[in-house]
Amino acid sequence: MAREFSRTRRIGQQLQQELAFVLQRDMKDPRIGMVTVNDVDVSRDLSHAKVYVTFFEEDPQVIEAKLAALNTAAPYARTLVAGRMKLRVMPELRFIYDASLVEGMRMSNLVSKVIRDDEAKKGHIGDEPQEGQREED
């Protein structure tokens, strides 16, 4: 049974690579634009695959439009990938926006901002004269 899971994982990794190639080179839909395939989760019976993608866009409406275009083009992408992979059953593709990368970047920026603010506060505290010391002109 563990072998079955490793097979689905291997197929998911290969599917991720092939989809990334197909989306960059063979898909000419201008609505999709630049897309990154982050992960592919394949079901045990290989009938379905969830494809997690990110875009270089932050506007939620643009992201939804690109995701809708990808899901509309999913059968065509499936056909192109099926020609590149040797599987008896090619999973149906469902594209899902992966917000984890964006959230990770947002959290990293927040941590960096807090560190900068903390260092700025420490710098101001160190500049103040202590008791018994006077400022020299």
UniProtKB/Swiss-Prot annotation:
Descriptive protein name: Ribosome-binding factor A
Family stated for the protein in its record: Belongs to the RbfA family.
PANTHER family recorded: RIBOSOME-BINDING FACTOR A, CHLOROPLASTIC-RELATED
Keywords, ordered alphabetically: Cytoplasm, Ribosome biogenesis
InterPro entries in the cross-refs: KH_dom-like_a/b, RbfA, RbfA_dom_sf
One Gene Ontology molecular-function label: ribosomal small subunit binding
Subunit structure as annotated in this protein's UniProt entry: Monomer. Binds 30S ribosomal subunits, but not 50S ribosomal subunits or 70S ribosomes.
Pfam families per UniProt: RBFA
Job of this protein: One of several proteins that assist in the late maturation steps of the functional core of the 30S ribosomal subunit. Associates with free 30S ribosomal subunits (but not with 30S subunits that are part of 70S ribosomes or polysomes). Required for efficient processing of 16S rRNA. May interact with the 5'-terminal helix region of 16S rRNA.
Major place of residence: cytoplasm
Gene Ontology CC annotations of this record: cytosol
Subcellular location: Cytoplasm
Entry-linked Gene3D superfamilies: 3.30.300.20
Biological-process GO terms, alphabetical: maturation of SSU-rRNA
